[in-house]
C-alpha cells in the first residue's frame, strides 16, 4: 500500500481494523508499537509503521451533532466531506477545511493540515475535545488548556478515536478562479491578495512569471465579491482543475456560482481520485 503520491510505502506487519473502542485497546495491549492510519495522504512516513497499523475503515462513522452548542463529535475514519454534509443538513459549518474532502478529520487535525484563508486558523483549532486510548490501554479525554499541546499530536499521545469540533452557522459560498496573475504583482500585494476573501489559494509551478490559478472562495454574508479582473489576474470562463489538464469533473463549483459551503469549500469533490 502506498500514499496518494506513491512516495511512501506502508509495510506494516499487521493491519488491524477495529470496530469498537475495545478493539483499539486490545490492539494496543497486544503490540509493541501501534500507529493509526488516516486517509494515507501524508507526504511523509508519520503513519508508516512496520509493526502494527490501525485502520479505521470499519470503525463506526459517528457524527453526533449538538445543534444548541454548535458542536460535533466525530469518530476516527470520518472524512471531512462526510462531516460537511451532515453539518450542513443541521444548519452548521466548519470554520475551515482542507483542499480535499476525502482526508479524515482525526488524521488531518493530528498532522496539522492547514486549509486556506489568511483569516482562518488551521483545522485543528476547531477541536474542543480529544478522546484517545494511551499506550497503557487507558481512556484519556483532553480538554481545556491541555489542548494546546495535544491538537496536533502527530499520533504520539495515543490512538484518537473521537474528536469534538466547534462549528459555526452554515453559509453560502461563491467561488471564482483567476488565471495568470503576474507573480511579482502577487508577491508585492501578498497580504491583500491572500486575505481578500474567506479563502484564497494560489497554484503555481514556479516555472514562469505567472501564478497559474488563484482560487477565491467568498463568504456570501461577509465578503465583497471580486470582479472579472483581480490584481492582473482574469476570471476563468470555464471550470478548471488545480492540476492543469486534469479532469474538471472532480473540481468543485466555480464561475461565481453560489451554493452551500460543502459545494465549493474544498477544491475537489467526493469521491476524490487518490492520484490527484
Language-model features: locations:
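Glycine-rich N-terminal segment of FAD-binding domains in flavoprotein oxidoreductases
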Residues: 6-102, 109-117, 202
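Terminal, non-catalytic protein-protein interaction segments that mediate quaternary/complex assembly
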Residues: 21-25, 35-41, 159-161, 181-183, ...
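Short acidic-glycine loop/turn motifs at beta-strand connectors
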Residues: 49, 66-68, 134-136, 206-209
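Short polybasic amphipathic segments
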Residues: 61-63, 128-133, 216
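FAD-binding subdomain of flavoenzyme oxidoreductases
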Residues: 108-196, 207, 223, 227-234
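Loop-centered beta-sheet repeat module
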Residues: 198-199, 204-244
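Conserved small/polar residues in nucleotide/adenosyl-binding loops
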Residues: 266-272
Amino acid at each position: 500500500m502506498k500514499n496518494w503520491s506513491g512516495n511512501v510505502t506502508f509495510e506494516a506487519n499487521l493491519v488491524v481494523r477495529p470496530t469498537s473502542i475495545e478493539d483499539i485497546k486490545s490492539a494496543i495491549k497486544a503490540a509493541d508499537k501501534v500507529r493509526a492510519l488516516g486517509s494515507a495522504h501524508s507526504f511523509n512516513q508519520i503513519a508508516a509503521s512496520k509493526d502494527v497499523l490501525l485502520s479505521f475503515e470499519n470503525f463506526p462513522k459517528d457524527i453526533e451533532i449538538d445543534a444548541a452548542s454548535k458542536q460535533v463529535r466525530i469518530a476516527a475514519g470520518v472524512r471531512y466531506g462526510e462531516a460537511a454534509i451532515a453539518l450542513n443538513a443541521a444548519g452548521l459549518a466548519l470554520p475551515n477545511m482542507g483542499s480535499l474532502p476525502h482526508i479524515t478529520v482525526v488524521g488531518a487535525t493530528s498532522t496539522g493540515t492547514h486549509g486556506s484563508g489568511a483569516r482562518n486558523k488551521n483545522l485543528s483549532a476547531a477541536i474542543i475535545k480529544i478522546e484517545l486510548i494511551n499506550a497503557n490501554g487507558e481512556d484519556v479525554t483532553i480538554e481545556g488548556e491541555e489542548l494546546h499541546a495535544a491538537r496536533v499530536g502527530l499520533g504520539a499521545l495515543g490512538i484518537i478515536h473521537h474528536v469534538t469540533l466547534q462549528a459555526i452557522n452554515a453559509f453560502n459560498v461563491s467561488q471564482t478562479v483567476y488565471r495568470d496573475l503576474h507573480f511579482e504583482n502577487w508577491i508585492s500585494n501578498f497580504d491583500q491578495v491572500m486575505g481578500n476573501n474567506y479563502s484564497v489559494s494560489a497554484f503555481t509551478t514556479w516555472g514562469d512569471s505567472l501564478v497559474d490559478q488563484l482560487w477565491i472562495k467568498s463568504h456570501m454574508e461577509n465578503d465583497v465579491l471580486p470582479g472579472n479582473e483581480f490584481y492582473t489576474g482574469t476570471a476563468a470562463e470555464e471550470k478548471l482543475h488545480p492540476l492543469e489538464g486534469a479532469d474538471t469533473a472532480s473540481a468543485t463549483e466555480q464561475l461565481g456560482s453560489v451554493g452551500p459551503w460543502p459545494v465549493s469549500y474544498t477544491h475537489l469533490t467526493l469521491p476524490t481520485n487518490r492520484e490527484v
